Amino acid sequence: MFFFEVELFDAHVLISKIIKSANQSIFLFDNYIDETVLTQLSKKNKGVTVKIYIKNISRQLQLDVEKFNTQYGSLQVIEFGKSHDRFLIIDQTAIYHLGASLKDLGKKWFAFSKLLIDPALILGKLDS
């Protein structure tokens, strides 16, 4: 899908639907996380675990995550510097490539694609 800068709400709705579709897990690779992304992730179903992989975990982000977990639970941030692009993996079965950070969706033109690869290809590299 392709979104123009005026399609902020449409981009937000699409991401919300994808987040709500998760029944078990969400993996997010995005180096530009802030509280707006946590707000989007608060729409997850109860019991869904979230792991965010980010290059640097700021003190502010850590505080925001602690508050998120107090109310919604099951969110973990992990320092990870190997990814330049942004990816969203749902239930270890679907993987999306994001042309923009979740916090910036709809601010400028960007593309959003579902990849036809097995998410295990990426998830299997996390422990190595």
Where do the language-model regions lie?
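PLD/PLD-like phosphodiesterase catalytic module centered on the HKD motif
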Residues: 1-12, 21, 27-128
